[in-house]
UniProtKB/Swiss-Prot annotation:
Signal peptide as annotated in the record: 1-19
UniProt subcellular location: Secreted
Additional information: Found in injectable (milked) (IV) venom.
UniProt-annotated stretches for the region Disordered: 107-146
UniProtKB keywords: Cleavage on pair of basic residues, Oxidation, Secreted, Signal, Toxin
Tissue expression per record: Expressed by the venom duct.
Gene Ontology CC terms: extracellular region
Chloroplast keyword on record: no
GO terms, molecular function: toxin activity
Protein name: Linear conopeptide
Lineage of the species this protein comes from: Eukaryota, Metazoa, Spiralia, Lophotrochozoa, Mollusca
Superkingdom assignment: Eukaryota
List of residues that carry Methionine sulfoxide: M40
Primary location recorded for the protein, binned into one broad class: secreted
Length: 146
């Protein structure tokens, strides 16, 4: 009985939320209907477990194991495998050992690396020593006030 009252309340509130235009009534008057007086007794309901409701009804997963998902049946596992340029031989590393990786870094051309100097300019920026004196033309880390 309680479920029937709740279902009726949901139905009435849904009808009030989306009113349909009726002949002879202005469009705004459709929202002005009041609830059924029998449904007003729902305000005095106490909380607690509803009758007929099992304790394990609200589970975080679907306990209905007979109905599987579609992708379990028709999806090819080979399609789902992650592919990259290094996965030709299963999970073989791109470099067999650490020495091979260091050889790759030193023997390959430098412009292939993301940290390569793009303009091939001089990377020597001079002495980065903090100095409090104000010397023109030299880099300073901080001012005298610091």
């Amino acid at each position: 009985m309680l479920r029937l009252i709740i279902a009726a309340a949901v139905l009435v509130s849904a009808c009030l939320a989306y009113p349909q235009r009726r002949e002879g009534a202005p469009a705004d008057a459709a929202n002005l209907q009041s609830f059924d007086p029998a449904l007003m007794s729902m305000q005095g309901m106490q909380g607690g477990q509803m009758p007929g409701m099992a304790g394990g009804q609200f589970l975080p997963f679907n306990p209905n194991l007979q109905m599987g998902y579609k992708r379990d049946f028709d999806e090819n596992l080979e399609k789902r495998k992650q592919h990259s340029q290094f996965n030709a031989d299963e999970n073989k590393a791109p470099f067999d050992s650490e020495e091979n990786f260091m050889n790759f870094l030193h023997n390959e051309k430098g412009d292939k690396h993301p940290f390569a100097n793009v303009d091939s300019a001089d990377t020597d920026l001079g002495q980065f020593e903090p100095s409090a004196e104000n010397k023109n033309g030299e880099f300073r880390f901080f001012d005298k006030e610091q």
